[in-house]
Structure formats: structure tokens, C-alpha cells
Amino acid sequence: MPNEVYDVTIIGGGPIGLFSAFYSGLRSMKTKIIDAEPAVGGKVRYFFPEKIIRDIGGIPAITGENLVANLKQQAETFHPTIVCSERVVDVTKLADGTFQLTSHNGSIHFSKTIVIATGSGTFEVNKLEALHAEDFPFAIHYDVKNIEQFRDKVVVVSGGGNSAIDWAQTLEPIAKKVHLIYRGEDFKAHEESVRELKNSRVEIHIHHEISELIGTNNQLTEITVCCNQTQTTKTIETEALFINHGVKVDLGTMAEWGFKQADFGIVVDDEMKTTVPGIFACGDSATYPRKIRIIAAGLHEGPIAINSAKKYLEPTAADEAMISTHHESFIG
């Protein structure tokens, strides 16, 4: 039904949005997820499907692909409506308090509350635009769907953040050789990841930047790197190049929706309330003092946002859902 009104609409179908949808089901809320991408999963699905995620309690290690699959299966427990390939561009509060959400394609959605779980917004990788990179469309990579294609190959990773280091470590056991190129010296990554990197077989080239791509017939065979301290150059043989130079994020029109924002997201209180009554935020969308930006923390914030939405609709409702082991939905 086009004018159907939902109790809560979750904008963003990444890990936090998916778990929030599961929890809203525990609270018997009619739920919709709207995601801008063709499928749910967020950045984890698109950029880290084969990376190992280790920052969720009780799960020592899981690939991004499997994490998303598990969260999607869990979210579907209570049959939320999931809408993909729609980017919400406008939110208006109607006279009766209902929110009208308008998508980029003109679709209209109605909801009594909204939970924003869009992460840092829509995203686009920073691509290597210079050095005739377009000549090597099959050798330059920004994400990976099948890591096995790099088995026994010489691979170069460029970047100095968590993503670059994670890829270097993920590729190291299967590639013939892995080089890591970083223009700086102090890696912008978790301390333990850096320690493991330095103890691995990955050959690290700090203070170096890629200055030339060499190959024929769309096949990359070598790269030249230049030391930004001495201006000396060296050539590295390679068959594949990973570029991890960050992403461009876009909050779109959210700045116009009326809530307070800061440098790192939408300002919320300890109940995940934004400055607009009825709109809540969680995960990387939200910011507050001493916030921890890991998936596990977002999985905690999602239920808080849902509980606040429930109380907004029903002030006398319980503060939180019955735990799943005692919830009526799971008792025979």
C-alpha cells in the first residue's frame, strides 16, 4: 500500500540498520528499511566482503560477507519491509506528527518515527585518477569480491589506514608477495594491526608514493614509486594494485532536515535522540562524547534508538524488549 504508515523507518541497511530492524521486531514495531544501494550490507558488503572482522564480542573472526548474511537473516525474523536503491532526499513532519520521506526517484514513504543508520552517508572510493590508471582496468582494485583471484600473485597495496593494512594482511597468506606503499610513516590504524603488519612477510615502503604505472595491453607489470624524502625512485614488479586512499562520503540533504550536526555525525543524547523529536540516530551516523566507532558499539546503539522510538510512540511502554531467550516469539 503506497500510503502505509510504519512505526519506524530505518534509513540505512548496513549492519547497524539490520540489527536495529531485528530489535524493532522484538518491540512489535512495524518496520521498514530504506537503503540507497542495490542490496543491504552497507560499506561492509561493498568494501570488506572477504575481510576478517574481529571487533564483535563472541565472534572471534568472521568475513564481512558472512556477517552481513547473518544480520540480514536475523533482521528478516520479523519480516520488515526492505526497500533498496532509494536514497532519501527529504523528510517532512506532517501536521499529525507523521514523517513523510521522499526518495530521489519520487517515491513517498510514511513513518511515525525515523532511525538514521546511514553510517557516514553514501560513499564513493577515492580512485587513482592520474598516471593513466584507466589503461589498467582489470589490474587496479578498490574492493574485492573474490580473494582467490590473487593467489600466488605479486600484489601492491597503497594506503596507510585500517583498510590498507587489513588488505595487506588478508592477502599475505595467499599471494606470492605483498608490498605496502605508504606516503607517510605513522600508520593511521589500530595499534595491534600495525604490530601484526610489521611482524608479517609484507614488504613495507614508507615515505613512498606511486609515480608511474607500467604495462602493456591493459596488463600491469610494474609500478615505480618515489621516496618523498629523498626523491629517489625504485621499480616494483606487480600483477595487481589495490588502492585504499579513503572514500568520499556524502550526507546528501540530511543537513537540511533540521537536526544538529557536528564534524563526525548527527548529535545525539544518551538515548540516541536527535534534536528533532521522533528522529533518532545510531552507528557511525551519530556522535556523542567518548563515542567508540566499531561495529560492536553500533550494535548496542541501535536497540537504544529503537527503544527511544518505542517510548516516543508509547510513553507507557516498557523501557526495553524482553530478552530473546524469553521472548514470546521464540518460545515454543
Curated annotation (Swiss-Prot):
GO terms for biological process: cell redox homeostasis. It catalyses: 2 reduced [2Fe-2S]-[ferredoxin] + NADP(+) + H(+) = 2 oxidized [2Fe-2S]-[ferredoxin] + NADPH. Its EC number is 1.18.1.2. Its cofactor is FAD. Binds 1 FAD per subunit. GO terms for molecular function: ferredoxin-NADP+ reductase activity; flavin adenine dinucleotide binding; NADP binding; thioredoxin-disulfide reductase (NADPH) activity. FAD binds at D35, K43, F48, V88, F123, D284, T325. Keywords: FAD, Flavoprotein, NADP, Oxidoreductase. The keyword Oxidoreductase applies. InterPro entries: FAD/NAD-bd_sf (IPR036188), FAD/NAD-binding_dom (IPR023753), Fd--NADP_Rdtase_type_2 (IPR022890), Ferredoxin-NADP_redctase_2 (IPR050097). The keyword Amino-acid biosynthesis does not apply. Belongs to the ferredoxin--NADP reductase type 2 family. Homodimer. This is Ferredoxin--NADP reductase 1. It comes from Listeria monocytogenes serovar 1/2a (strain ATCC BAA-679 / EGD-e).
